[in-house]
Amino acid sequence: MGSLNIQHNGYDADVEKIREEEYPMLKDSIYLDHAGTTPYPKSLMDRFAQEMTTNLFGNPHSASASSQLSTQRIQDIRLRALQFFNADPADFDLVFVANATAGIKLVVEAMRCLPTGFDYVYHQSSHTSLVGVREEARSSVCLDTRQVEDWLSGSCPFDDNEDEERPILFAYPAQSNMDGRRFPLSWSSQICRQSLSPTNKRKTYTLLDAAALVSSSPLDLSNAETAPDFVVLSFYKIFGFPDLGALIVRKEVQDVFLSRRYFGGGTVDMVVCLKEQWHAPKDGFLHERLEDGTLPIHSIIALDVAMDVHAKLFGSMERVAGHTGFLARRLYQGLKGLRHANDELVCAIYSPDPETEESGPLVAFNIRNAQGIWISLAEVEKLATLKGIHIRTGGVCNPGGIASALGLEPWEMKQNFSSGFRCGTDNDTMGGKPTGIIRVSLGAMSTIADVDRFVQFVKEFYCEDTPPILPPPETKLDPSLRNTPELFIKSIVVYPIKSCAGFHVPPGIDWEVRPEGLVWDREWCLVHRGSGQALSQKRYPRMALLRPNLDFTKGELQVTFAGDISSSPGLPSSISVPLSKNPKMYAPKKSGMSSRVCGEEITPQTYASAQINDFFSTVLGVPCVLARFPPGGQGKGMTRHAKAHLQRHQHQQPHPAVSVSTRLTKPAMMPGAFPSPKAVETPPSPPDSDTERSATPTQEAQGPKPRRILLSNESPILAITSTSVDALNQSIALLNPSVSQPISEAVFRANLVLSPSPSTPSASPSNPLTPSPSPSTTSKPTPKPKQKPKQKLNPYEEDTWSSLTIFNSSSFSSSSSSCSTPSSSGFQTTTKFQMLGSCRRCHMVCIDQTTGSKTAGGEPFVTLSKTRRFEGKVFFGVHMGLQAEDEEDGHAEDIEKEGTGMGMGTGTGTGTGTRSMGGNGSVVKVRVGDVVRPSYL
């Protein structure tokens, strides 16, 4: 073993030397997704560019000198590619295709045209592209390894009454792209012998998916008698470039393709169209009949260069296989050795042990915390991305392998689908089981440092090296000690355009709240012209530099770009759109495009103005259009609903001033409320709010309606506390001292920032474009309620809130109320909000909202992942929405009912109004400085 380590350390040292020069794109990155594709070296691209600039390559279907040069080079490269796999051109032909999947489709296209069709057998570890073949077969069956061995021993996977003339196609991977498990190449020879047996009347063909195997190991086709009939592979998995694949066909079975019906340009000698329909396929080499249209000339030329450079840099494929195998063993043992403080394994590994079973250089696994709860795949990938680690997570296009490894029965997979699971979504744990895996795969240019750094990454963020803290014993506290903290609204921020900068509501201004959220919040979005996807800062961080201003005097949304536009002379630095819903501003509905927000399809109103759309496209450098999703929409694509819900960790963290028994027995509901007099609308509100549409009798009978939202991700309103932000910054200073600047509250993009200290709003707004409030709303300070000694607000205490009550001191008027003006005792309205659950975070919090660039050290997400991860997900802040009238929780005792204008009863008494969503004639408003009182779960 010592000499083996020395040998591989020598290879590793060689790779380290060339990586800086040959793979500059790998600087500061740990690339561990070679099973997807491998990086290409710089010298390959340089030499290919030289080939293209010094030679003239023409269409090989012509007779010119340039065309003949192309034909000659293609013939030479085809032979060289066969020799790369030790395939004798006398026994094999190679057909150039786009990728392995295209090769599979070519085989299936021929098999389905056979007079009897074909039956299909495939291994459960097959790639999705092999699984899809079953849809073209007369019948199909999926077998695991034991069942394949039984079949090869004589048992037939099909009924005896099947057509004896119908051939069977057996497909399997040489190496699983999911867990790296390798399957015997001898299966092909066994199938061949069985097919030739006198007792077997059915011809069986073999299709080998070698794409995963050849990426790091040699494939030997020197024995044509035992080789598979068809082999498919992708060259980019070996060399990184070009994007090209191959179908290698054993010439003995090439007659299968005689039944293929389709023909393309260059594959026929004669075609008759008029009066008769007849054609004569080329009768020379098989590839001449199968390579439809013009070949990808330049990609084939690049393949020649790629084989040269690969051999120069890494030597033989046997040498690559030895190195990657060594790294795979190191990776497997490193992950296997990680344990929590309670001795539970950190990683559940699905790949075979490379020390005892032949497997490829990849490891498939999932991560559990010390309590055995699965860590979210999406959270792992988010954190890996921040650390410059490139891995693959999810189903990895291997449904059978995933189902087998994770113990997912068909009914469970169908149930997951019905519950909303889709490929590429964040629903990675359903029904207590993961829906995918983490895949780490190695390649020729991988190093020991790559492996060690990844193992250290898992250890640092997911290995719990201290025993879990046991919950405190149950104790019942004296009711007099159950005080709630008094909080204040420190700031109110609306984000008119989804994922762009926020508009800070000036002090002294009342801001309307509707069931769908703060008025004007996330009513617009930018939509990619091609994909229809709503743009997000996660992909386009420069969106943070688009600064909105709501100018109610002019009735405009003004957007200024705070970045550099010097490269676009003549481009204005700002643009304006009217707040009114002027139909002339929008593109005709027939050309309106649908969009997707958080996986949901919506039908926004897109703006027709080229000036508006060009402004956003230019400053962001992405083709996009401005679209609006106003409240009040009806029908498919016009409504969205909140998805936030209480998380399990919120039920497990009692408020410090509430006993465990009290917390568990108190229902998480709010007391009822009645409508307050309608407020003066300052600032103006958009029309057609959801509050203006009453529920139908059918809806009322079905119970509370789901909460409607506009373009926010999960809920109407997002809130954070300054106390939690301060605590997080203290944690960052402790865990990541290299970060010199504290994290701003702005990175969390909250609508409400709550603070235990009252703000000191100025007498008038600092924004001259915002209307000045009336004297009655600015001169009268918010009255402070009489209360018992204040309870200190602890960091992250918001996780334990069931509801919030906000005391607003605005002036209200209503013809139906005697309380048309504030009373001398200090008229206040109380607005109730229900807490909808903790906010799950992604690495978008790592974008500096001032500069549009990434924050230092991947903060705050890196520290959040260490201090705020529950059940594998990272949380910070809380979702909330207006309390519905039917959501009563009996928490009135937590809010004092003394004669202070802040009573939480029925609203009777001195100058008290209690409001919730949907009240007729009421308008809910909040302002900076309002008093906030929480109730607890």
UniProtKB/Swiss-Prot annotation:
Pfam families assigned to the protein according to its UniProt record, in alphabetical order: Aminotran_5 (PF00266), MOSC (PF03473), MOSC_N (PF03476)
Instruction: Name the residue ranges with Gly residues bias.
Output: 900-921
Q: Which residues form the active site?
A: 397
GO MF annotation list:
lyase activity; molybdenum cofactor sulfurtransferase activity; molybdenum ion binding; pyridoxal phosphate binding
Q: Where is the composition biased (Basic residues)?
A: 638-652
Flavoprotein recorded as keyword: no
Record keywords: Molybdenum cofactor biosynthesis, Pyridoxal phosphate, Transferase
- List the cofactors: pyridoxal 5'-phosphate
Modified residue annotations for N6-(pyridoxal phosphate)lysine: 237
**Which protein, by its recorded name, is this?**
Molybdenum cofactor sulfurase
Species lineage, top-down? Eukaryota, Fungi, Dikarya, Ascomycota, Pezizomycotina
